[in-house]
Amino acid sequence: MDAESTDAMYDKQKLLNWFFYLAPVWFLLETFLWPGFRAGVVTGGNAWGNALFYSVEAGLGAAIWYKMPYAETSALVENVLYLIFVLKFILFAPLDIALSMEGDSGRTAEMIKNYHASLPGMLYSMVFLVYKIKNRVSLN
């Protein structure tokens, strides 16, 4: 791998790390404007759960910013765990929506809205993992 493509990869990773640095902004966004953006998949939209989720993300952001040992690995592990929850959500949420269609249409509409709202957070985690794993493989 030449130096120019390696530098470009590091620049993309630095850009992806800003997601962690801006965790308080994402928490406010999810709390007031976009419920279910990212933490809602894991916490079900609970405000305290969201606060805990974004506290972990902010802590990872601080660790990455200060170049703490294992910060990048911890961020990778956090995103892998998040994607495990996402996989469960992707597989079972449509079944829950289908089962709720018969009785309660208000709840069904809310579940559909939450499903759509969480897609950008899922996509971000997938992109993050691809770049981090690609970097780990290229360094070895």
Question: What name fits each language-model region?
Answer:
Residues D2-N140:
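Topology signature of small-to-medium multi-pass alpha-helical membrane proteins
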